[in-house]
């Protein structure tokens, strides 16, 4: 027959439900925050406070934030930067968010055990910051499709995320008079 649930079993079950609700509400809040930021960035309704930013320092700090996660996934990070300081006029918060979104994308979709290349190039006039990695999934979509909001490759549907990261990164880059291009070649992903 049926056995009655003890008080401790009921408490355990309720505690598990509460944890699930909390996790789901955090995901929903992140989605709403990302949507709001994407909307503001796309429409130009996001404040931009340009200042002189040291790209090398900012990129190194952002890469440092991902060091443990990359290590857990056996990703080897190779950073190549000019010896001289590379400075740009940008909003440091927005540039940080661009780096964070791109590194988070790499963490989620890079082939475990592969290399991640972060390059800063400066030709005297333009500064290029290049993120390159091998994808764990076939890159069957065009770069334009990958930049669209809510777009995620079919093979990555089971991964955490809402498909806004690249779209936000592109909008924030353009908002600061920059340009972001995605290049795919087989399983090579380059921004």
For each of these PLM feature ranges, what is it?
Residues 138-151:
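Short conserved segment of the HATPase_c
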Residues 43-48, 87-90:
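Conserved micro-motifs of the catalytic ATP-binding
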Residues 49-53, 71, 76-86:
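Conserved catalytic submotifs in the C-terminal HATPase_c
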Residues 106-107:
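Short helix-loop "hinge" at the ATP-lid/N-box region of the Bergerat-fold HATPase_c
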Residues 20-28:
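Short alpha-helical segment of the dimerization/phosphotransfer core of two-component systems
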Residues 177-178:
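Conserved glycine-rich
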Residues 49-67:
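A conserved beta-strand-to-alpha-helix junction within the catalytic ATP-binding
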């Amino acid at each position: 027959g049926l056995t009655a649930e003890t008080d401790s079993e009921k408490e355990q079950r309720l505690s598990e439900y509460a944890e699930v609700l909390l996790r789901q509400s955090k995901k929903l809040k992140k989605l709403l925050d990302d949507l709001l930021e994407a909307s503001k960035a796309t429409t130009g309704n996001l404040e931009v406070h340009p200042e002189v930013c040291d790209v090398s320092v900012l990129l190194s700090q952002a890469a440092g934030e991902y060091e443990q996660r990359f290590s857990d996934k056996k990703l080897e990070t190779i950073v190549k930067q000019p010896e001289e300081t590379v400075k740009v006029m940008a909003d440091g918060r927005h540039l940080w968010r661009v780096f964070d979104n791109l590194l988070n994308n790499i963490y989620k979709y890079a082939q475990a055990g592969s290399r991640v290349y972060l390059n800063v190039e400066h030709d005297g006039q333009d500064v290029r910051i290049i993120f390159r990695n091998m994808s764990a999934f076939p890159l069957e979509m065009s770069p334009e499709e990958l930049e669209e909001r809510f777009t995620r490759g079919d093979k990555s549907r089971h991964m955490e995320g809402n498909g806004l990261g690249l779209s936000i990164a592109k909008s924030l880059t353009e908002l600061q008079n920059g340009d972001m291009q995605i290049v795919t070649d087989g399983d090579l992903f380059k921004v």
